[in-house]
């Protein structure tokens, strides 16, 4: 399955990419309604570095999520993949492209939900809506930082 979210940011692509390189960028992008604890933070410029978080699925079921950085191509793209966590598979590309108004930030996620056919059946209701809300928040946080002078 695939999820894509885009936003136009009135800032240079280099600035948008630089936001993601901030030491606390990941923490800034966690929505306040999410119960997430960062156990280990990755350095996006280090291929193979891992972020480890603990969260709760549906607010109840604890889950440990390990994501490894697999690509780093500044100032255009970096990628992380789930090593272990709530999905059967997860690949997230963070893409920054030049745009006439500044930069286009595009998040592309390819994932396989848990629970096989049941997971695929409920993905549009539970997973897609959660991703939409979360990435709307993340993009707004990124936009505000990048457009601030």
Describe each PLM feature range.
Residues 15-20, 26, 51-53, 69, ...:
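Hydrophobic pocket/interface hotspot
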Residues 13-14, 44-46, 71-75, 95-104:
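A short, structured loop/turn motif at beta-sheet edges
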Residues 9, 57-59, 71, 86, ...:
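Beta-strand elements of well-folded, non-transmembrane domains
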Residues 1-47:
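Hydrophobic ligand-binding cavity/cleft-lining segments
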Residues 38-84, 137-144, 148-149:
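Glycine-rich portal/gate segments that line the openings of hydrophobic small-molecule binding cavities
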Residues 6-10, 37, 54, 68, ...:
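Generic structural detector for well-ordered beta-strands
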Residues 81-133:
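Beta-strand/loop substructures that line and gate deep hydrophobic ligand-binding cavities in soluble
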Residues 2-4, 62-66, 89-92:
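Short, surface-exposed coil-to-beta transition loops
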């Amino acid at each position: 399955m695939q999820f894509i979210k885009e936003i136009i940011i009135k800032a240079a692509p280099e600035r948008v990419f630089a936001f993601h390189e901030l030491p606390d960028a990941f923490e800034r992008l966690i929505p306040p309604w999410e119960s997430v604890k960062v156990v280990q933070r990755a350095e996006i410029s280090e291929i193979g570095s891992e972020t480890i978080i603990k969260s709760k699925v549906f607010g109840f079921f604890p889950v440990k999520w390990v994501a490894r950085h697999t690509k780093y191509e500044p100032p255009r793209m970096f990628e992380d993949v789930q090593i272990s966590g709530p999905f059967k598979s997860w690949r997230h590309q963070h893409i920054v492209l030049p745009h006439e108004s500044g930069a286009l930030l595009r998040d592309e996620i390819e994932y396989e939900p848990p629970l096989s056919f049941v997971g695929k059946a409920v993905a549009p209701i539970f997973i897609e809506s959660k991703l939409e809300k979360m990435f709307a928040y993340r993009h707004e946080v990124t936009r505000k930082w990048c457009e601030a002078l």
